[in-house]
Amino acid sequence: MATLHFTKGQGTGNDFVLYADPDGTLPLSAGQIAEICDRHFGVGADGVIRAVRSKRLPEGAEALADDEAAEWFMDYYNADGSAAEMCGNGIRVYVRYLIESRLVQLADGDTLPIGTRSGVRDVQRTLSGFQVDLGRWRLAGGEPLVRAKELPVARLGLGIDLGNPHVVVALADESELESADLTYIPHLEPAPQGGANVEFVVPHEPLVKDGVGRIRMRVHERGSGETLSCGTGAAAAALAVRHWAGENAPGQWWVDVPGGTVGVRMFPTEDGEHVALSGPAELVYTGALELA
C-alpha cells in the first residue's frame, strides 16, 4: 500500500490536493481521485493536481515542443476523476506549491512557463499573488439555452473557449443569482460534447468605476459541481459581459465570487488578444494518506 504525501491548497476558495510525482511513477486512478476529493470520506477538494516533469508525459512533450522552458506540467483532474484541460485558480496554487516545495525558484516579477492540456501558460509572481496569461480566447459554442434549478425562465448563454469550454449566462439581479440551485447540473440546449462550465453573472452598480468593470459570479464546474471560485470561469464571465456591453467596455475587471475576488485583464499580443487572471494562492496544510 503506497503512501501519498500531499499538500492542500486554495485560490479564492477553489481548493485542491497537490502532490509531487516528478518522474511520473505515481498516477492516480479516477476512482482514487474521486475518493480523495470526497468531502465526507476523503480529504475534500475541487480537484487533484499532480506535479510532474513535462518530459514524463506525452502531453508534456507537446508543451516542451512549444516552450523548452516548460519543465513542469500541471496534471489536473476534476473531483470526479476526469482530466481537465486547464484550471486558472489551480495553476496559481500549483506554482506556489512548486516554489514552496523547492522544485522551482521564482522571484517577484519573474515568469514561469507551465505545461497544461490546453498548452503552455505563463505564470508571473506578483507582490499580492500570481498572474497567469490564459492565452487567446474565442467565442465558441454559440448561444445555448440554459436552464438551472430554481430559475423559472431559461436564458440564452454565450459560449467562450479559454482552452476549456464555458457558457456564461446573464441574470437580472442579485436575488436571481442567489436563488439558483447549482447543486444540480445546468441543462444546456444544445448540449456541448463533453459538457461545459456554466457561469451565472450579474453586474455591479455601477458596472464600471474608474475605468474598471465589476461583476459578481457563481459557477457550476464540469466534473466538480458548484465551487467557490473558477479562475477560467471568471475570465470567461468578464469577457462575456464586455462583449455584451459594447466597444466602450473596459479591458480590466474585478470578478467577485463566493470565495473572494480575482482580477481579469484583456490585452493585445502579436497572435491576438489574450486574457490574464490574477489572484491569491495559499497552501493550507500538508498530510499523508494510504492509497488503497
From Swiss-Prot:
Residues forming coiled coils: none
UniProt-annotated site: Could be important to modulate the pK values of the two catalytic cysteine residues, residues: H166, E221
Its EC number(s): 5.1.1.7
Enzyme class: isomerase
Record field: catalytic activity: (2S,6S)-2,6-diaminopimelate = meso-2,6-diaminopimelate
Chain ranges passing through the membrane: none
GO cellular component terms listed in the entry, alphabetical order: cytosol
Keyword terms of this UniProt record: Amino-acid biosynthesis, Cytoplasm, Isomerase, Lysine biosynthesis
UniProt xrefs under InterPro entries: DAP_epimerase_AS, DAP_epimerase_DapF
Top-level taxon of the source organism: Bacteria
GO molecular function: diaminopimelate epimerase activity
Ligand binding (substrate): N14, N78, G88, N89, N164, N197, E221, R222, G231, T232
Keyword Acetylation: no
Pathway assignment: Amino-acid biosynthesis; L-lysine biosynthesis via DAP pathway; DL-2,6-diaminopimelate from LL-2,6-diaminopimelate: step 1/1
Keyword Lipid metabolism: no
A single GO BP: lysine biosynthetic process via diaminopimelate
Location in or out of the cell: Cytoplasm
NCBIfam families: DapF
Function comment: Catalyzes the stereoinversion of LL-2,6-diaminopimelate (L,L-DAP) to meso-diaminopimelate (meso-DAP), a precursor of L-lysine and an essential component of the bacterial peptidoglycan.
Family note: Belongs to the diaminopimelate epimerase family.
Name of the protein described by the UniProt record: Diaminopimelate epimerase
Organism: Leifsonia xyli subsp. xyli (strain CTCB07)
UniProt lineage: Bacteria, Bacillati, Actinomycetota, Actinomycetes, Micrococcales
Gene designation: dapF
